[in-house]
Structures are given as structure tokens and as C-alpha cells.
Amino acid sequence: MEKMVAVGADHAGFPLKEDLKAYLKDQGYEVLDLGTDSHESVDYPDFAGRVAAAVASGKVPWGMLVCGTGIGMAITANKVPGVRAACCADPFSARMARAHNDANVLTMGGRVVGAGLAREILKAWLESRFEGGRHAQRTAKIQALEERVGGRTKGKRSAPGGPGPARGKGRDR
């Protein structure tokens, strides 16, 4: 099971997911593809939830998600207790996500990184290991916070267009 990765994407991440799925198989990984299976417009939380649930349940040890930026996938996956998703756009961040944060889900942006760089990021993440030590103390604090407030909080939403820079006449939306 150590060499098994659940993958998922929305329509914006579909082409990169397919490339990375082939890369994983070439590297000897078993791949659990949880969708999407086309360029048709879909909602990223549906696929992030599937992959995050597979990781959190122990069905697979690792997950990889791709959307336009990787951000929405990371936000969604991190709502699932036990998931530590990191959005990475370079190999160094991917290594540190595993070494220091024990990230078990990697997210990337199909509109941010090309296939070659995405393979380097994925390789760096898969080959890294959690260092433990002082980092274990920190991840334990994350887990304690998750247990204390997980599922009971209601995040506030910003109104469309705000907060943020002033918007008005002559400004792009």
C-alpha cells in the first residue's frame, strides 16, 4: 500500500492529472483515480473530498489533487480530519511539506505549473520523508487543534468583490 496514490482533479487539472497518473505508474506506483475523467466543467470540492476521504480512511497513504491553482483543492482537502494537504509549485516546497509538515496530500495548479515541473514536484514530495523531532511536536499541535475545533467552526465568507482592494469605476473585476 505504501506505493499507492489516490489522484483527483477538476476540469482545469484534468490534463495534468492524466500526465502525472502515467508518471506515477512508470515509477511503480499503484494509482487510484477518483476523477474527473474529462474536460467537462465540474466542481473541485467533489474530487478533493473523494481523495481526502481515501487518505483519511487509510485506504491509501497519499493523495494528489490538481485544479487550476491547487488552492481550492488544498482548502477543501484540509477540511477532512487527518488530512494535511499542501499546495506546492516548486520541488523545495514539496520536500518541506513532507519533511516538516508530514503532508499526506499534494495539490498543484494545472494553470500554474507545466507537466515537467509538476513531475519534479511530485517526485520530490514522494521521495521525501517526515523528519519527526521538533516537527512531530508541531504536527501534534495541529492534530490537537483539529480534534478540538474540527467540524464545529463556521468560516465567514467574504461578500463577492470584497474584502480586498477598492473596486469601482475603471477597475477590473
Predicted regions and their residues:
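C-terminal binding/interaction regions
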Residues: 6-8, 12-13, 91-173
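A short beta-strand-loop structural module common to alpha/beta enzyme folds
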Residues: 30-41
